[in-house]
C-alpha cells in the first residue's frame, strides 16, 4: 500500500489515532479526519510526520452530505483515495422505552449515513484505478445486539448490510469491502464503564483488546495479501462471540 492515499474518519479517537499511525507506518499517505476534535487530529498528524510518515488532516461533518462532498472534492484534486477506513461513530445509550428520537437519529446519522456520505463520492475515482480497500469499524453490538444500544446496534448492523452489498458491486473492480467488529477495546470509555472483574466475566480471554490489535487486522485487510477477502464481518472480541 506504499504511497496510496488513505482516509481515516474519526481519526483522533482511541482506535482511529492508532489506526492512522499504523497505516502511515505501512507506507500510506494518511488523511486524518475529525469534526469536533480537530486539535487531536493535528496531534496525530504531527506524530506521524515526526516518525517519517506522510499525513494531513481534514475537518468536516460526516452527517452533512453537502459539506462532506465539498471536502472530498477538494481532496480528490490531489488524486484518488484508494483506502477508506470508517471509524467515526458515537454512542448515546438508553433503553428504547426511554430513548428520544434525537438519540436514535443522531447515532444512525453518523455511523450509517456518514458511511454513505464519505464513500459514495470517492467510488468512481477509486474504480478508475481498479484497486481499493474499504474497511468499516463496527461493533460486536451490531452482530449480537446489546441492552440500551438499539440505536447503535441498528447503525452498525446497517453498516454490515451496506458493506456486503457494496462488496458485491465492486468485486470485479479490484476493490474489497469489509467490516471489523470489535468487542471490548482499551479506551477511556471502556475503563470508565467496566471494572476489571466485569471484563474477566464477560470476555473469555479475560482482558480487553487493544487499538493496536484492531489496527493490525485493518492493516492486513487493506494489504495486497487480503485481495480475495471481501464482504466479510470479522470479529475481534476475545471469544465473546
Predicted segment positions?
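Conserved glycine-rich cofactor-binding loop
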Residues: 12-13
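Residue(s) in the substrate-gating loop at a strand-loop-helix junction
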Residues: 139
Amino acid at each position: 500500500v506504499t504511497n496510496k492515499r488513505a482516509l481515516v474518519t474519526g481519526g483522533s479517537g482511541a482506535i482511529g489515532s492508532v489506526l492512522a499511525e499504523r497505516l502511515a507506518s505501512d507506507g500510506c499517505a494518511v488523511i486524518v479526519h475529525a469534526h469536533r476534535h480537530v486539535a487531536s487530529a493535528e496531534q496525530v498528524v504531527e506524530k506521524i510526520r515526526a516518525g517519517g510518515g506522510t499525513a494531513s488532516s481534514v475537518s468536516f461533518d460526516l452527517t452533512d452530505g453537502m459539506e462532506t462532498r465539498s471536502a472530498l472534492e477538494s481532496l480528490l484534486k490531489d488524486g484518488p483515495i484508494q483506502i477508506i477506513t470508517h471509524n467515526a461513530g458515537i454512542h448515546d445509550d438508553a433503553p428504547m422505552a426511554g430513548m428520544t428520537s434525537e438519540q436514535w437519529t443522531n447515532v444512525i446519522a453518523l455511523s450509517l449515513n456518514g458511511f454513505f456520505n464519505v464513500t459514495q463520492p470517492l467510488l468512481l475515482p477509486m474504480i478508475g484505478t481498479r484497486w481499493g480497500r474499504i474497511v468499516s469499524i463496527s461493533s460486536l453490538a451490531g452482530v449480537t445486539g446489546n441492552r440500551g444500544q438499539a440505536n447503535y446496534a441498528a447503525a452498525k448492523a446497517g453498516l454490515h448490510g451496506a458493506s456486503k452489498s457494496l462488496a458485491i458491486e465492486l468485486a470485479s473492480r479490484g476493490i474489497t469491502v469489509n467490516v471489523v467488529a470489535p468487542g471490548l477495546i482499551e479506551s477511556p470509555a471502556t475503563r470508565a464503564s467496566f471494572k476489571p472483574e466485569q471484563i474477566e466475566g464477560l470476555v473469555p480471554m479475560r482482558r480487553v483488546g487493544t487499538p493496536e490489535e484492531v489496527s493490525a487486522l485493518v492493516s492486513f485487510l487493506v494489504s495486497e495479501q487480503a485481495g480475495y477477502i471481501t464482504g466479510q464481518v470479522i470479529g475481534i472480541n476475545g471469544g465473546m462471540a
